[in-house]
């Protein structure tokens, strides 16, 4: 195993409150406050369009995506923070020589901005978003293209995420997969190769050679 790919929301960072805040402002601007859900976290993971489609259903309009992005870009890191142990885990993996990358369904620019503000971007060899390659997870394309840029084969890679989209993308790309149980965890049909209760479990997984190097 030479490269580890990370999802962003619900894996590296807890961004639920800021996403909920942007959604609240969006619905208020559109006069659709009554559609604000009780639990925003269950809609996170597929990107802005998917979030709004699930929340608004037949009331969704394409132009609402930009309204949400406007509000989110204004304040992307009010409450957002890395999960406990994430900085330690990234530091430990980097010191062991692993290539690290972020494969998010968020916009690339926004993903980079958030990681910069949180002082995490320096750990990663590559950061890509849902708009980088024209396809989002669960498509395997973002995973395969990221590995291609890094010069690595899928068999030498592990993807860590908290949703079906992450696990399916990894499996379709031919990587090993690990479910981040500390995240928003939306797993239905996909079965990961590994489950991680806390970020530091990933370091132990590598140290114990459970995954062949």
Swiss-Prot record:
Record keywords: Carbohydrate metabolism, Hydrolase, Magnesium, Metal-binding
GO cellular component: cytosol
Positions of Mg(2+) binding: 7, 9, 162
A Pfam family it matches: HAD_2
Reactions that this protein is recorded to catalyse: 2-phosphoglycolate + H2O = glycolate + phosphate
Cofactor requirement: Mg(2+)
Residues forming the catalytic site: 7
GO biological process, one term: DNA repair
UniProt-recorded Gene Ontology molecular function terms: metal ion binding; phosphoglycolate phosphatase activity
Sites where the protein binds substrate: 38-39, 43
Pathway: Organic acid metabolism; glycolate biosynthesis; glycolate from 2-phosphoglycolate: step 1/1
E.C. numbers: 3.1.3.18
InterPro entries listed in its UniProt record: HAD-like_hydrolase_sf, HAD-like_sf, HAD-SF_hydro_IA, HAD_2, HAD_sf, PGP-like_dom2, PGPase_prok
Highest taxon listed in the record's lineage: Bacteria
Record function comment: Specifically catalyzes the dephosphorylation of 2-phosphoglycolate.
Assembly: Homodimer.
Name of the molecule in the record: Phosphoglycolate phosphatase
Species of provenance: Aquifex aeolicus (strain VF5)
Lineage of the species this protein comes from: Bacteria, Pseudomonadati, Aquificota, Aquificia, Aquificales
């Amino acid at each position: 195993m030479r490269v580890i790919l990370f999802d962003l929301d619900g894996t590296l960072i807890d961004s639920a409150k800021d996403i909920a805040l942007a959604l609240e402002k969006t619905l208020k601007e559109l006069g659709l406050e009554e559609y604000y859900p009780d639990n925003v976290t269950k809609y996170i993971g597929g990107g802005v369009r998917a979030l709004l489609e699930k929340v608004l259903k037949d009331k969704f309009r394409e132009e609402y995506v930009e309204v949400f992005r406007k509000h989110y870009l204004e304040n992307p890191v009010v409450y957002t923070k890395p999960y406990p142990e994430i900085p330690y885990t990234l530091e430990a993996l980097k010191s062991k020589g692993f290539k690290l990358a972020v494969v998010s369904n968020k916009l690339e620019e926004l993903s980079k901005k958030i990681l910069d503000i949180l002082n995490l971007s320096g750990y990663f060899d590559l950061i890509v978003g849902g708009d980088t390659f024209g396809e989002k997870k669960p498509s395997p394309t973002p995973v395969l293209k990221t590995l291609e840029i890094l010069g690595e084969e899928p068999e030498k890679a592990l993807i860590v995420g908290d949703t079906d989209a992450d696990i399916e993308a990894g499996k379709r790309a031919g990587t090993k997969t690990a479910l981040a149980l500390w995240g928003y965890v939306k797993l239905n049909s996909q079965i990961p190769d590994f489950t991680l209760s806390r970020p530091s479990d990933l370091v132990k997984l590598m140290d114990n050679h459970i995954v062949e190097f």
